[in-house]
A protein has these predicted regions:
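Short beta-strand segments enriched in hydrophobic/aromatic residues
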Residues: 30, 84-86, 119-122
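Hydrophobic/aromatic beta-strand elements that line small-molecule binding cavities or substrate pockets
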Residues: 14, 65-71, 86, 101-107
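A short, structured loop/turn motif at beta-sheet edges
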Residues: 71-78, 106-112
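A short hydrophobic beta-strand element
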Residues: 75-88
Length: 123
């Protein structure tokens, strides 16, 4: 598998794990220091995000991939932009579908890629 294929696979695995509430998969593919910057600007640490998925404060109901673009790989660092239609209930709100754009950052550690940072916006 090429580096490009590996980071695309990680992006897709994260989206699948969010919907399936596969917390062990999220823990495995996210760096311990991973931060998720939400559309509101709130910067959320990895374990808080996973906890909110576990407790249904953030319920991801579906995620439909529309585009992956701007893939950049430099040695052991990489990034991409993924665009998905995400249906979710967030922090007590109703069910909504967002055109969610994620700027994803990756690092290669011990020969394996891991997600290090994410920034959410809409497209």
């Amino acid at each position: 598998m090429t580096d490009q294929e590996a980071i695309i696979q990680l992006y897709r695995e994260e989206n699948e794990a969010m919907v399936a509430k596969n917390l062990s998969k999220l823990n495995q593919i996210l760096a311990p220091t991973m931060k998720l910057t939400h559309m509101t600007g709130y910067v959320q640490p990895k374990l808080e995000w996973i906890d909110q998925i576990q407790n249904d404060e953030m319920q991801y109901l579906s995620s439909k991939e529309e585009n992956i673009k701007d893939i950049e790989i430099y040695d052991n660092q990489a990034s991409l932009i993924g665009q998905n239609q995400v249906q979710a209930k967030i922090w007590g709100g109703g069910v909504n579908t967002w055109p969610l754009q994620m700027k994803m950052y990756f690092a290669k550690q011990n020969g394996n890629w891991i997600i290090t940072n994410q920034v959410a916006s809409t497209y």
